[in-house]
A protein has these predicted regions:
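Catalytic-loop motifs flanking and including active-site residues across diverse enzymes
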Residues: 1, 88, 92, 170
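Glycine-rich phosphate/diphosphate-binding loop of Rossmann-like nucleotide-binding domains
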Residues: 1-37
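Structural signal for hydrophobic packing residues in well-ordered secondary-structure cores
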Residues: 22, 45, 49-53, 178, ...
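Glycine-rich phosphate-binding loop
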Residues: 37-136, 140
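Glycine-rich phosphate/adenylate-binding loop
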Residues: 100-102, 115-200
């Protein structure tokens, strides 16, 4: 997300980066909206969606959350945990797909197996224009790496495979694809991050 925000800002986009906790420094000129939970991220993105041209959901949002979060750290001796009940978090990307009008929507899929099959299924289910998929178990790819190897899938069923590249270069390739979308389905200035771009 940070590489995308930097690349979009360098192209002249007005970028809002909605980010969970990280040690990364926001790119210069990018507005940061920090969040800590999936619900906070949902509220931040949904509240700004109407004035956005392009939304790129690059964050790996947790699929589940504890049903009853503890107010403080649980001590093993005082209250041993024998089970943990989980509830599904809201599907932010699907909600954006249902709400959108002319916005461009780009999703990400971090997979560990059957990469393209799962990515194509997610692209259709979420209603996005592009889906960026990567195998997070592959060497040099995924979280905590400065490089990534991805597929970029579109709604016509095409899947472009990118070689292992620096994440900033991957970000530029993704933005290049955004600019190939038909007028009216994209902004002339793409935005990025798990974030938004204000309409002018």
């Amino acid at each position: 997300g940070y590489a995308l925000a930097e690349a979009a800002q360098a192209r002249g986009a007005e970028v809002l980066l909605v980010s969970g906790p990280t040690a990364l420094t926001p790119p210069a000129g990018v507005e940061l909206c920090p969040v800590t939970t999936a619900e906070e991220m949902r509220k931040a993105v949904i509240s700004r969606f109407s004035w956005s041209d392009t939304v790129i959901m690059a964050a790996a949002v947790a699929d589940f959350r504890p049903t009853q979060p503890a107010a403080q750290k649980l001590k093993k001796r005082r209250s041993p945990v024998t089970s943990l009940e989980l509830s599904p978090t809201d599907d932010i990307l699907r909600e954006l797909g249902e709400r959108r009008t002319t916005q461009v929507l780009v999703g990400f899929a971090a997979e560990t197996e059957d990469l393209l099959a799962h990515a194509r299924e997610k692209l259709q289910a979420k209603g996005v224009d592009l889906l960026v998929a990567n195998d997070v178990t592959a060497a040099g790819s995924g979280f905590g790496s400065d490089t990534n190897r991805v597929f970029i899938l579109d709604r016509d069923g095409r899947a472009e495979e990118l070689p292992l590249l620096p994440k900033r270069e991957v970000a530029d390739r993704i933005l290049d694809r955004v600019l190939t979308l038909p007028t009216g389905r994209r902004s002339t200035k793409p935005a990025a991050g798990t974030g938004t771009h204000r309409k002018e």
